[in-house]
């Protein structure tokens, strides 16, 4: 990125409300038993907490948890000298509480909250006036402290340093790159089989889902809908989050079925069919094994929906369903040209930057709309999270692991959007017989872009819009390969690959006299023999596509209705259409 853009991004990040987790170490005032740690939320703009517990002095906790400390009347006669004040949240601002505590000699302020913890905010002038730390403690943790240690305790506030890199990033990297590579490969192979294989209507279960070609109008409508939905989620999160969860359950079960169906069809058992009937869907007489598969996929989705908040294991189901959903979408949605790929990626590139870096200037809270929606608003009453992410718990041990942020996230959009470009590259590879150089290069570029995202995440210590790094890496790499091979014209327009069902091999130029079928097959290159191999395995009674004038893969020189044979341009590596 340009230096100016990076500087602007950093300035916008600084404008957001700072919020960090810390640790409250509690020991009994009488000594004896071992201490215990509790999670706190603090704002370092009031005052920073030390990172090393050994450099922190234990101070007495002054319990005024029944007082809100909003006026001088709430300050006890015996002030807070060399003590940490504990007060209740409410009735006045954080600044008023901490100003009174600091004026009474307190070395820190703990605010107990029965609601969800939120960052203790202030403004720049107030931050400069205050020199003691301010932190929030949950009411549940306070009750546990009193139950274990009583009301006479010594406490210390500190913020231990976290590991710069967590091993869960490796798992997220493998899942993301693997999904993009597998989805792109599957999408290209699926299209080739559809073009090369004569469609048959006598076996409904073997029919593949039709791909959906994306047009520029569809891209614009999609982006507008994304913006509209994101704003709705920002203002009506508690109501719409359950709608999103329901949609995810339905879509992910469909994706899981689509991924497992090809494997299940190869099993040698449960091939019996449903008896004749007039029921919806069942009138097609599906096989028993496919019904069992559908039941299994729905069950997995329902189990996740019921136990989605079980942090110990529900994330495994969510990631499995999410990967299946992404693979299904990459196979179903098709960008027909590189022009469409560029339009989609650039528009979503701007969309991602706007909702992460620009919206903090437009919201009253100063928070990013994208970050608020992705992580769940701090004032949400449901505490639900959107499921449209891959999530992996933190694997490194840290005192901060007791706080409520154990997962690293990667949104589905950061997989699907570049993945559609990877899928297009694979289809173009097959068209020009380029040994999959576009597919491999774009997949590697995606992996490098994801690594850059992780590095930025570590350096900036803040959630990053991954498309900021993924879009330039994948688009520039694809363009570079096309220019190097002198195929930019064909790569940009798709060379008619999406406009008509063509075979992936190039036809010879000019009229060529008919040849014996066996001789022509023997003269084909090895790559073309492999491409045509599905035709040799057609079931008995199927029509030979080469002899059927209505077949989409009929020979390019087969005249129909007296039309004159016309030469077809060749698209070969090293040339442009």
UniProtKB/Swiss-Prot annotation:
Stretches for region Disordered: 502-577
Q: What is its EC number?
A: 3.4.23.-
Membrane-topology descriptor: Multi-pass membrane protein
Keywords, sorted A to Z? Cell membrane, Endosome, Glycoprotein, Golgi apparatus, Hydrolase, Lysosome, Membrane, Protease, Signal, Transmembrane, Transmembrane helix
Residues carrying sugar:
91
UniProt key word Protease: yes
Which GO BP terms apply? membrane protein ectodomain proteolysis; membrane protein intracellular domain proteolysis; membrane protein proteolysis; regulation of immune response
Q: Where is this motif: PAL?
A: 465-467
Q: What is the residue range of the signal peptide feature?
A: 1-19
Show the stretches that span the lipid bilayer.
169-189, 217-237, 240-260, 287-307, 313-333, 342-362, 406-426, 439-459, 464-484
**Domain PA: from-to ranges:** 49-149
- Localization, UniProt: Cell membrane; Golgi apparatus membrane; Lysosome membrane; Endosome membrane
Q: What enzyme class is recorded for this protein?
A: hydrolase
Question: Which is one Gene Ontology cellular component term of this protein?
Answer: endosome membrane
The record's Pfam families line, in alphabetical order, gives:
PA, Peptidase_A22B
Query: What job does this protein perform?
Result: Intramembrane-cleaving aspartic protease (I-CLiP) that cleaves type II membrane signal peptides in the hydrophobic plane of the membrane. Functions in ITM2B and TNF processing. Catalyzes the intramembrane cleavage of the anchored fragment of shed TNF-alpha (TNF), which promotes the release of the intracellular domain (ICD) for signaling to the nucleus. May play a role in the regulation of innate and adaptive immunity.
Assembly and partners are described as: Monomer. Homodimer. Interacts with ITM2B and TNF.
What is stated about domains? The PAL motif is required for normal active site conformation. The catalytic domains embedded in the membrane are in the opposite orientation to that of the presenilin protein family; therefore, it is predicted to cleave type II-oriented substrate peptides like the prototypic protease SPP.
By sequence similarity, the record places it as follows: Belongs to the peptidase A22B family.
What name does this protein carry? Signal peptide peptidase-like 2B
Annotated source species: Rattus norvegicus
Upper lineage? Eukaryota, Metazoa, Chordata, Craniata, Vertebrata
